[in-house]
Curated annotation (Swiss-Prot):
Reaction catalysis annotation: Exonucleolytic cleavage in either 5'- to 3'- or 3'- to 5'-direction to yield nucleoside 5'-phosphates
Protein name: Exodeoxyribonuclease 7 large subunit
This protein's UniProt keywords: Cytoplasm, Exonuclease, Hydrolase, Nuclease
Designated gene of the protein: xseA
GO BP terms, alphabetized: DNA catabolic process
E.C. code: 3.1.11.6
Gene source species: Chlamydia trachomatis serovar A (strain ATCC VR-571B / DSM 19440 / HAR-13)
Amino acid sequence: MSITSPPIEVSVLTDSIKNLLEKNFLRVVVKGELSNVSLQTSGHLYFAIKDSKAVLNGAFFHFRSKYFDRKPKDGDYVILHGKLTVYAPRGQYQIVAYALTFSGEGNLLQQFEERKQRLAAEGYFDPKRKKPLPSGARVIGVITSPTGAVIQDILRVLSRRCHQFQVILYPVTVQGATAAQEISQAIQFFNQNSMGVHALIIARGGGSIEDLWAFNEEELVKSIVASSIPIISAVGHETDFTLCDFASDVRAPTPSAAAEIVCKSSDQYRQELQNLRRYVSSHARQFIAAKKNLLTHWQRHLASVDFYHTAQQTLDYTRAALERGIETKLEYYKQRFAQYRRWLKSDVLIRIEKHLADLNQSLMLSIKNKIYTKKTSLNQLYTSCLKNELLNLQHRTQHSRNILSQLSRRLHIAIASSQQTHQECLVRLQNELSFTIQHLLTKAKERCQAIQEQASSLNPKNVLKRGFAQLFDFNKHFVIISAESLKQSDLVRVCLQDGEAVVSVKEVWLNNDKKG
């Protein structure tokens, strides 16, 4: 822009800068330390990300709906995926993020998968080597922190479900550099000391992947596999999986569930096995197929419009999370199904089944009625869950549509404003161009008139009009401008204003001297 260019408004300049940034920095990945973190009630996250030399402000819209399990704080090192834009009211460039990863989690997940595949190949997770839980376990070893809520949950469940039981607590730290070693030592202690323990529970509450990393150590996996006492793993929440879960004989989604599993009666095992078999065979595939068809429908519907890529991305994340949850559920129920089959094959359960076969017809009828009642309850629960999932998906879809509608309206307003601004600028430029052309034409006319006047004053014919004459030789070959070129009796052609005349030279004078 030159110095003579007309001035523009601040908003126009800001919009130009914004367009340049968004066009050239559509996708960026940046890492650094968070500061000034603010999570609003609307679910939007505002922050600044910095390193030792620079600070960049940023925003993450709808953060709470995507990362509900962990809230970032000042000082966290993160990796952001997003785009650069300009916040016009402040004239400030910022990053608008659509994905956030806590620094270190990516490397830990890669280590987890590599270690899991290697140990699985070595046979540490082989279902054939897993030990069945004894029926009616009464002496239970618990390996966990003595001060947390986990041990209290286990004791509360055991007190409610079991009339006679004994818990032997081995206190350990469940997080940190020494946690895996302490838990391994606890397992060895129970195996080396004859204390009559029927089963062991390794328990801990939920946390991030860093918090649960002790349960992914190879040392702990090998100690679990080497144990002669059956081990129940109850680490983290239901969606958390550690290598301890894969190596243990039974995996429980929570510490409370571990206490329920360890003291279940044989008729409960039988009933749950039947219910799980019906549930897995009758509903799992239908549920997965229905969800995939629904997601495919919405994906095909929204993918046809490039402008709706944000909603498409949100639906993709939702579908991936849903598929992971379904796979996790299936893996969990498969493990429980295999475990129950092993229990039913044990000698104790065979004797129980033989005894149950001898019961009278009234007892069998009562059992069938209970099974029917439970089946009806499960069907109702399944129907309710499916309706809730569908309603939740509809709400999310409607929310995405509302967002897209708002963005569309904002885009139309922005386009109209931009067109008006460009139209005003075009009118101003046309006026300036007309003025400049008119000024140049006036100057050119004045210059032409001056040249015409000068040419007119130099025209010989105009000089003749003032009483002068022009002399030529008789044949008009050349102009006579000096008396020296004349001699007596020469014929000279004289050009006047209105004609010509031929004269004869009588005498010639040069500078008052007479010649010939």
